[in-house]
C-alpha cells in the first residue's frame, strides 16, 4: 500500500518521462484525477483515462513530448507532504517560473492551478509544482 498517493503518482510520471515512455499507469484516487485535470489544462500531459479492470480502478496517463522528443515536463515536485503541510496565501500564488510553471493548489474551490487561485482570490495547500 502506498502512503502518499500524490507523491507516488508524481514519481511515476517523472520516471516515465525520463524514460520517454508513451504512457504510465497510476493508482486511482479522486485527488490524482483533479491534479491530472490541471496538468491537462496547462498542457503538461496529452490525456488520461480512468480504467476499471476486475473491479480495481487505475489511470492511464499519456505523456506529452515536443517535436524533438523531449518531455514537456522539466521538473515535477511534491510541495506539501504528509509530515509537513505547506499552505500558500493568495499573494504567494501570483506567478511561478515566470508563467512557465504551475503550482497545483487545493482550495475551497477545488484543486486548481496557481493563476486560477490568484484570480479567484483564494489560497490553499500547495500540493505540487510542475514546469
UniProtKB/Swiss-Prot annotation:
One of its GO terms (biological process) is translation. SUPFAM superfamilies: Ribosomal protein S8 (SSF56047). GO terms for molecular function: rRNA binding; structural constituent of ribosome. Signal peptide: none annotated. Keywords: Ribonucleoprotein, Ribosomal protein, RNA-binding, rRNA-binding. Part of the 30S ribosomal subunit. Contacts proteins S5 and S12. One of the primary rRNA binding proteins, it binds directly to 16S rRNA central domain where it helps coordinate assembly of the platform of the 30S subunit. Belongs to the universal ribosomal protein uS8 family. This is Small ribosomal subunit protein uS8.
Amino acid at each position: 500500500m502506498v502512503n502518499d498517493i500524490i507523491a507516488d503518482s508524481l514519481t511515476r510520471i517523472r520516471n516515465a518521462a525520463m524514460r520517454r515512455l508513451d504512457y504510465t499507469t497510476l493508482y486511482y484516487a479522486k485527488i490524482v484525477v483533479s491534479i491530472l485535470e490541471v496538468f491537462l489544462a496547462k498542457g503538461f500531459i496529452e490525456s488520461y483515462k480512468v480504467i476499471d479492470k476486475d473491479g480495481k480502478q487505475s489511470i492511464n496517463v499519456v505523456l506529452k513530448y515536443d517535436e524533438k522528443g523531449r518531455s514537456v515536463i522539466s521538473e515535477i515536485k511534491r510541495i506539501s507532504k504528509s509530515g509537513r503541510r505547506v499552505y500558500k496565501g493568495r499573494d504567494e500564488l501570483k506567478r511561478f517560473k515566470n508563467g512557465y510553471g504551475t503550482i497545483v493548489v487545493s482550495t475551497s474551490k477545488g484543486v486548481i492551478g496557481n493563476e486560477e487561485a490568484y484570480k479567484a482570490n483564494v489560497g490553499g495547500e500547495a500540493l505540487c509544482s510542475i514546469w
